Amino acid sequence: MQVVLRQAIPGLGKPGEIVNVKPGYARNYLFPRQMAVRVTPGILKEQQVRLEQEAARKLAERQQAENYKTALETIGRFVIRKKVGEHDLLFGQVTTSDIAEVVLATSGLDIDRRNILLNEEIKKTGVYPVQVKLHPEVTATLRIQVTPE
């Protein structure tokens, strides 16, 4: 018997998925607990429309991430000013929060600091490449320039 899940069920599927289950399982467990409904032609059409809308939304998100990537990479360098001691060593280090603030101030794009990936700790002045994950499939590479105050 085919049913549409209303909520996530471990080992069976996610909400909105159409799955095959045994009739007894559907009648005695899923239907009484309102975890699933029987598949009808109307529900199939509704499901198809929902899937198309979801695909369009994901495509729009990816396109927007590509636009942000292009905008960020055309800026060139993002400059961060920090206090410096001997041998161009910073007092402290450049954090992902610092990078997010500079990107917001320079480009107006608010990036979550958890999406910024540092290959190495930034403890000296210089230019460093930094990866920013804008979308699960889109990653931008920024150039961060650390200069003395």
UniProtKB/Swiss-Prot annotation:
Similarity comment: family membership: Belongs to the bacterial ribosomal protein bL9 family.
Any GO BP annotation: translation
PROSITE patterns, alphabetized: RIBOSOMAL_L9
Known role: Binds to the 23S rRNA.
Gene3D superfamilies per UniProt: Ribosomal protein L9, C-terminal domain, Ribosomal protein L9, N-terminal domain
Gene of this entry: rplI
Name of the protein in question: Large ribosomal subunit protein bL9
Alphabetized UniProt keyword annotations: Ribonucleoprotein, Ribosomal protein, RNA-binding, rRNA-binding
Any one Gene Ontology cellular component term annotated for this protein: ribonucleoprotein complex
Superkingdom of origin organism: Bacteria
Any one GO molecular function term: rRNA binding
